[in-house]
């Protein structure tokens, strides 16, 4: 009797054989599974983003609680018309360079360039902000003010960033002749200061990050995604041996000065009139102490020391016609006396020898005379940064002491190793005297043979003194002048 074989219930690989599915159904199931996984991933990323945001908020609150107050600031206002008094374009640029140097020497935080001529009395063509790319304001400004502001910004910018922010322009034609500011934030490549100025690069980075050029060999990966071309201040993180990339954190431009006390340059602002100096202040509370300079003001030597207690101080300088002319050309100001606009109206050089003092000269004189009168509410912290921010050594002006000592020791070693040189320590008669070179004949003395050779012949001319000539005078007609033909 034949036996019937049972149908197989499993495949050769051990998997149960189920009902047959079409490829359409299989693809639908795969798409649904893929969609579910993608949705779970998005939910997980959203949850992580919320957690990171909450942690960042807590960290920001903690940092804000620990942050130090910003130090007190010093601002100066200079008229743009001072460039019109220069006789050439080179002198215009040089005057702007003098103002920039004075601002950096006395640690000025803001430079305001204002128009003291006014729109009604301006004779040359105005250029709008939109046409020059300086902003979106509809106001106008004189070309001299624009040139002064542009040169001031150019000199303040670190050298490795100028090509990103300053294209070729006729106002900067002679900027290469100007003296460099050499401020602390103009760092060299070998400087190891933890703060650096940089620009965001157009370079692909991971999400939430971007690359910044801070003047090093390689770009720095910063912690925020910002559009390219923006100037930023980067706090450098200590580089670990395991990480190849240099990382940094974007911070406020005020943080380097607040944390280390180092001077971090100045900001430049343009004011269309004298009134805009006060009304468009970048500080929320405005300027609490204002000082005007004029030869009609109070003697600066009569002002007590440390009497100007300020948080945001402003010093205004006049042009060729003084502050009185700037006040008369401003239509928004109704006062006639400029002394009413300022808290203090001083004469920084009472006994001047010249009838006029140029604005770039008055700037140095005033800032030097007012140094003992200022009392900032929040002073800069004092930290020794000599090793991190070398002054003249970093710019190549002077040589460090260790370099001088090493060169001196090297030279001394070379002298000691010279075999021909003898050094006498003490006078001693027992030691043999050094050999003396034999005396040679005087090379300048004429021998008898040379004198015989030098005896003039009959056809030669001889120059003799007037004492050897006889008293009889000879006329030119009696002499034979044929030899001159």
UniProtKB/Swiss-Prot annotation:
It catalyses: uridine in 28S rRNA + S-adenosyl-L-methionine = N(3)-methyluridine in 28S rRNA + S-adenosyl-L-homocysteine + H(+). GO terms for cellular component: nucleolus. Transmembrane segments: none annotated. Its EC number is 2.1.1.-. Keywords: Methyltransferase, Nucleus, rRNA processing, S-adenosyl-L-methionine, Transferase. Its main location: nucleus. The keyword Membrane does not apply. The keyword S-adenosyl-L-methionine applies. S-adenosyl-L-methionine-dependent methyltransferase that specifically methylates the uridine in position 3485 of 28S rRNA. This is 28S rRNA (uridine-N(3))-methyltransferase. The lineage of its organism: Eukaryota, Metazoa, Ecdysozoa, Arthropoda, Hexapoda.
């Amino acid at each position: 009797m034949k036996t019937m074989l049972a149908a197989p219930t499993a495949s050769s690989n051990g998997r149960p054989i189920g009902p047959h599915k079409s490829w359409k159904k299989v693809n639908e199931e795969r798409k649904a599974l893929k969609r579910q996984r993608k949705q779970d991933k998005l939910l997980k990323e959203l949850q992580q983003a919320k957690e990171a945001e909450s942690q960042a908020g807590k960290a920001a609150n903690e940092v804000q609680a620990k942050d130090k107050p910003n130090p007190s600031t010093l601002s100066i206002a200079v008229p743009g018309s001072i460039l019109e008094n220069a006789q050439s374009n080179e002198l215009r640029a040089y005057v702007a360079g003098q103002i920039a140097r004075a601002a950096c020497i006395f640690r000025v935080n803001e430079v305001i360039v204002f128009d003291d001529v006014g729109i009604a009395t301006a004779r040359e063509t105005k250029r709008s902000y939109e046409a020059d790319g300086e902003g979106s304001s509809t106001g106008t400004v004189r070309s001299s003010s624009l040139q002064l502001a542009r040169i001031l910004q150019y000199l303040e910018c670190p050298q490795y960033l100028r090509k990103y922010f300053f294209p070729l322009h006729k106002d900067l034609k002679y900027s290469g002749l100007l003296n460099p500011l050499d401020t602390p934030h103009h760092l060299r490549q070998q400087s190891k200061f933890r703060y650096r100025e940089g620009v965001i690069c157009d370079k692909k980075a991971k999400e939430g990050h971007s690359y910044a050029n801070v003047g090093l060999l390689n770009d720095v990966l910063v912690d925020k995604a910002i559009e390219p071309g923006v100037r930023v201040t980067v706090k450098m993180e200590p580089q670990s041996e395991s990480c190849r990339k240099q990382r940094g954190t974007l911070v406020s431009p005020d943080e380097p000065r607040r944390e280390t006390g180092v001077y971090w340059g100045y900001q430049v602002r343009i004011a269309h009139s004298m009134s805009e100096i006060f009304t468009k202040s970048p500080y929320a509370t405005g300027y609490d102490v204002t000082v005007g300079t004029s030869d009609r003001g109070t003697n600066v030597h009569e002002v007590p020391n440390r009497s100007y207690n300020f948080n945001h101080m402003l010093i205004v300088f006049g042009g060729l016609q003084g502050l009185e002319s700037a006040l008369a050309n401003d239509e928004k100001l109704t006062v006639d006396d400029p002394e009413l606009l300022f808290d203090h109206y001083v004469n920084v050089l009472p006994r001047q020898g010249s009838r006029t003092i140029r604005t770039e000269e008055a700037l140095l004189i005033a800032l030097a005379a007012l140094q003992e009168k200022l009392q900032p509410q929040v002073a800069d912290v004092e930290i020794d940064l000599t090793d991190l921010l070398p002054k003249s050594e970093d710019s190549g002006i002077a040589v460090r002491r260790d370099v001088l000592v090493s060169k001196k020791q090297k030279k001394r070693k070379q002298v000691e190793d010279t075999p021909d040189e003898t050094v006498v320590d003490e006078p001693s008669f027992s030691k043999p005297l050094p050999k003396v070179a034999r005396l040679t004949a005087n090379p300048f003395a004429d021998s008898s043979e040379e004198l015989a050779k030098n005896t003039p012949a009959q056809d030669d001319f001889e120059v003799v003194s007037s004492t050897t000539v006889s008293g009889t005078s000879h006329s030119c007609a009696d002499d034979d002048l044929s030899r001159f033909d």
